[in-house]
Swiss-Prot record:
It holds the Pfam family RuvX. This is Putative pre-16S rRNA nuclease. One of its GO terms (cellular component) is cytosol. SUPFAM superfamilies: Ribonuclease H-like. It comes from Enterococcus faecalis (strain ATCC 700802 / V583).
Length: 140
């Protein structure tokens, strides 16, 4: 049973998958999307679902700090609804407040990554953090 974690933005979707036991999350890739052109990367996502034999999605939900749902969270929920419909797999949501900030801080402090390098991996690392937080919260 593998779970796929997604960090959905307006231009990219960071993708992570769990190990078979559901203990750890690993970053896979960043899928380029374009909301304005309604290109959401579903074809590539489908390839990854098959390759990793995914049984569930976890989509990051970027709530506001006061716990309200804003436009980005609504867009993430719409993305979740669409992938649930397309792939006929369950979708859970994980609060992702500050995960991108945490990911950026990690890359600066631990990896000493340049701004250009951080930009290339930040969404994938955020997807890992979203999925790992979900796995930790739902461990048996």
């Amino acid at each position: 049973m593998r779970i796929m974690g997604l960090d959905v933005g307006s231009r990219t979707v960071g993708v992570a998958v769990s190990d078979l036991l559901g203990w750890t999350a690993q970053g896979i890739e960043i899928i380029r999307i374009n909301e304005e052109e309604e290109n959401f990367g579903f074809e590539r996502l489908g390839e990854l679902v098959k390759e990793y034999e995914v049984t569930k999605f976890v989509v990051g939900l970027p709530k506001n700090m006061n716990n309200s749902i804003g436009p980005r969270a609504e867009a993430s929920m719409a993305y979740g609804d669409k992938i649930q419909e397309l792939f006929q797999l369950p979708v859970d949501y994980q609060d992702e407040r500050l995960t991108t900030v945490q990911a950026e801080r990690f890359l600066v402090e631990q990896a000493d990554a340049s701004r250009a390098k951080r930009k290339k991996v930040i969404d994938k690392l955020a997807a890992v953090m979203i999925l790992q937080n979900y796995l930790d919260a739902h461990s048996r």
